[in-house]
Amino acid sequence: DVAGRCHVVPVGVDLADVPVRSVDAPTPDVPTVLWNQRWDHDKNPTAVFNALGRLADEGIGFAVAVVGENERVDPREFTLARERLGDRVVQFGFLDRPAYADLLGRADVVVSAAHHEFFGIAVVEAIAAGCLPVLPAHQSYPGLVGDWADVALYPDGGLTTRLRDVLVDLPAWRARAVGLDASIRRFDWLTVVSDYDDRLERLAVDGPPLGAH
């Protein structure tokens, strides 16, 4: 039984410089929505930008920060989104680590529509900083948010609706997500590395599991 001899250990995320948000931190009049993933098609940024554009057309108040690594010569959908969202865009493009950590502490909502997400380091960083997640109910995300799935995950086709609900009443959604930021810090490298060390030490002492090759 291969499954019985296997154990998946998550990657560690460096959260040492990610700020911790106070549980009684005030909710801003204009919340900031953060998109902080790699600028590539598998992250499905167009779906996020379309949702934000529709909510902007409805007159819902929010600001947008679009950050992440970009190796594309012509990220057309990003350029169009910046033009459409106009003055709502408060940050656009790559940030060095100190500036990025500062932004994490100021953002209010982190959003994703990714088609492929094997873990989700950027999302973990944002949740650890106190951002309320708006994530699809697939990929790695259910495993990240655990007991907060009803708060953090939206169903297929439900991005715009969930994002609207969150932006209209962010304090209520934050109240439902209390504890998620602390829970996600279980992926901090300083926590994960002790599990790595324990398992490698047992393997060195006891040898591989029976039947392993």
What are these language model-derived features?
Residues 1-20:
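Donor nucleotide-sugar binding/catalytic pocket of nucleotide-sugar-dependent glycosyltransferases
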Residues 24-43, 49-53:
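Conserved donor-binding/catalytic core segment of Leloir-type glycosyltransferases
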Residues 76-95:
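Nucleotide-activated donor-binding/catalytic signature segment of Leloir-type glycosyltransferases, i.e.
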Residues 102-107:
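Short alpha-helical donor nucleotide-sugar binding micro-motif in glycosyltransferases
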Residues 115:
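Aromatic "clamp/platform" in nucleotide-sugar-dependent glycosyltransferases that forms part
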Residues 132-135:
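Short hydrophobic beta-strand element within catalytic cores of glycosyltransferases
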Residues 158, 171-207:
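A charged, aromatic-enriched C-terminal amphipathic alpha-helix characteristic of glycosyltransferases
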